[in-house]
Amino acid sequence: KINTINYINAEDNNSKLGLRSKVLKNNTFLKEDGYYSLKDLRKTYERFGRLQAVKYTNISFRELPYGEQLDCDIYINTNKPNTISFQPEGTNTAGDLGAAVRLEYMNRNLFKGSELLSIDLRGAYEAITGLEGYNNDNFEEYTVQASLMFPRFIAPFLARSFRRRINATSEVALMYDLQNRPEYHRRVLSGAWRYKWNDANHHDRYQIDLLDINYVFMPWISDKFREDYLDDNTNRNAILRYNYEDLLIMKFGFRYSYNKGLYAIRANIET
């Protein structure tokens, strides 16, 4: 029988506990004055293991000199919250050479609840060959992506027992992409809010795309490209012409998958 969880001690560079007490409580399934349970021990390890802010967890028990009681100590070692990475790239698209650079910033514990903030900046340049009749032969692309992921459901009216039973994430994401090609200029702005979770058995997985918006804006199309490909009113170019118009696409989706070794089931609904 566990008498008390004596204390929770975090070991990091600053010797400070970086997680809120509520986060620790919600991810601890061992109970004070409750019976020792191997299932609850494994579940506690699993829950702390999925937190981005946690590097590793160690749970130990000490027998008390009186009765059949234990003290439980949970030690948490946290990751460094901030990381920055820089990555140069070389590109080769159908023989056209180019270069790209990528800068990524991550914060694994933004609000002291193991929230993951990711900001990704990317710039690319490519010299395009084989084009005739255009003012330039350069392709430029600049992309900014940002996402914030919570290791839990961010939604009202959910019972605490349901929140503790499942492994869930809530994610909001934004992206802006700027493309300048010799044939056209394109801007893409997108945003999404989604939930993902799986039940305790890990066989069932769910995803709800509560909101998924994509806006495509074409500020400029060269006269030659329009004349060669878009002004033809035949059915052959109808789909091609649609791809170079301003578009606003909104989507709601639900995905379900079941996987148990020998067989799997997948279902997807979008509207």
Model-derived features: where do they sit?
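Periplasmic polypeptide-binding modules associated with outer-membrane biogenesis and secretion
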Residues: 1-92, 122, 127
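Transmembrane beta-strand segments of outer-membrane beta-barrel domains in Gram-negative
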Residues: 16-19, 29, 83, 134-271
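Transmembrane beta-strand segments that form the barrel wall of outer-membrane beta-barrel proteins
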Residues: 28, 60-61, 82-92, 102-103, ...
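Hydrophobic, well-ordered secondary-structure elements that form the walls
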Residues: 48, 105, 148
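Secondary-structure transition/capping motifs at alpha-helix termini
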Residues: 50-55, 76-82, 107-116, 155-156, ...
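Short glycine/serine/proline-enriched coil/turn segments at secondary-structure junctions
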Residues: 64-67, 93-96, 111-113, 182-183
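Amphipathic hydrophobic-ligand
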Residues: 97-101, 249-251
